[in-house]
Regions:
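Extracellular beta-propeller repeat domains
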Residues: 2-404
């Protein structure tokens, strides 16, 4: 599956599925400035070199008082990932280089700012080699909030944390006590307090309830909504699920494959009470017969609609990241496809009209974009590769801006 093993063994970072996560550069446009009128649509903010500065940013940095904070899944002094900051001028500083020991390793998820601290997850490392939830000061002092045991509490926290009422909520890709695929478990939904008290809200069984949740949760009207990469009623094609703070899980939708799409690793967004998301594959017969992915909408009571089917050509393929909404239009990225076959930034109307805003060339502008965020009308994001000749010639990733 291309994910991390229990002990945090990296299994292919630059790929079109499980090993990339979103880097969305959250910047303030009035500070950053944005591209001038008439300039190229896309601009590179920072290119990772793959050494001590980190490699393959895999999640969404956040803006805290004009400074960008984020993670790289690899690189750093110990080749186990970093927490970094970047100024609007593109000056990068490594705040913490993970050792791969008790402090964690391979931080896929983005950070969250809560109570003056940064919180995040690392998929590997920790006291039991099963990942950690960590806290960090903006000066770089890291503490482990919770170290997963590798048993019923979960293994490999990959999705971003969210905060509700001062408590953190997230998912683990494996663990939970039920046998699934490689016997590591099928994943969990959990809560953890800043003081380190962890509670499993739901442990996936790997059947119709779903298996291996990857993306971040969305909270709406007292319920958490999320997706699983596998499981469901149609042969491991993934699900949309709902779970309350007290734990009961409800299957909202089971992907069928074909036009309906299959396998999703992105979180959902709530737009006026309707949830929107992406599937990696399905939708048609392109992309070697497996389909090139879809954008879908779904109501909390399970009414699903395919908004757009990617064809795998200039329109893009494999939308691995989630969506954002701006003035009634959806924006997102595809990891592959486009004119340069290195991914795209696209817009999509609710009626299903898609427009490619930028096609990545795979060189200095990056390759494999993995997510966007809107800041005052400007889009910021990152590519998992490209930007230079490091990381075995494929580039170590970039932070970029796009004027929609």
């Amino acid at each position: 599956m291309g994910r991390l093993g229990k002990a945090g063994t990296e299994k292919g970072v630059v790929m079109s599925r499980c090993s990339v996560r979103v880097l969305c550069a959250v910047l303030v446009s009035c500070v950053f400035g944005g591209p001038p009128a008439g300039a190229a649509t896309e601009q590179v903010v920072y290119s990772f070199l793959g050494g001590s500065d980190g490699a393959h940013p895999s999640s969404s940095p956040i803006n805290v008082v004009g400074t960008l904070y984020g993670t790289t899944s690899l690189g750093g002094a110990n080749a186990s990932g970093t927490v970094f900051s970047v100024t609007p001028a593109g000056v990068e500083t490594v705040l913490h280089a993970f050792t791969g020991g008790s402090d964690g390793s391979y931080p896929w998820s983005s950070l969250i700012h809560l109570g003056g601290k940064l919180y995040g997850t690392a998929a590997g490392g920790g006291a039991n080699g099963s990942g950690v939830v960590f806290a960090m000061s903006k000066a770089g002092a890291e503490t482990v909030v919770y170290s997963f045991t590798g048993a019923g509490d979960g293994i490999e926290p990959l999705g971003r944390l969210i905060a509700v009422g001062g408590t953190l909520y997230g998912t683990t890709y494996a663990g939970g006590g039920y046998s699934c695929y490689d016997n590591d478990g099928c994943g969990t939904v959990f809560s953890v307090t800043p003081e380190g008290a962890e509670t499993v809200l739901y442990a996936f069984k790997g059947g119709i309830d779903g298996a291996e949740p990857y993306g971040r949760l969305t909270y709406a009207n007292g319920t958490f909504y999320g997706t699983t990469d596998f499981g469901g009623t149609h042969g491991d094609r993934g699900t949309v699920f709902a779970v309350t703070q007290t734990g009961p899980e409800n299957l909202v939708h089971s992907f069928k494959g074909g036009r309906d799409g299959n396998n999703t690793e992105a979180g959902l967004i709530d737009v006026g009470g309707t949830l929107f998301g992406t599937t990696l594959y399905g939708g048609g017969s392109g992309c070697e017969g497996g389909g090139c992915g879809t954008v879908f909408s779904i109501t909390p009571d399970g009414k699903e609609r395919v908004v757009y089917v990617f064809k795998g050509g200039n329109d893009g393929a494999v939308p691995i990241a989630g969506l954002i909404e701006l003035h009634g239009t959806l924006f997102g990225t595809t990891y592959e496809g486009g004119a340069g076959n290195a991914g795209t930034v696209f817009s999509l109307t609710p009626a299903g009209v898609e427009k490619v805003i930028h096609s990545f060339g795979g060189g200095s502008d990056g390759a494999g974009p993995v997510g966007l965020i809107n800041v005052d009308g400007m889009l910021y994001g990152a590519t998992n590769a490209g930007g230079g000749s490091g990381c075995y010639g494929g580039g170590c990733g970039t932070v970029f801006s796009v004027n929609p």
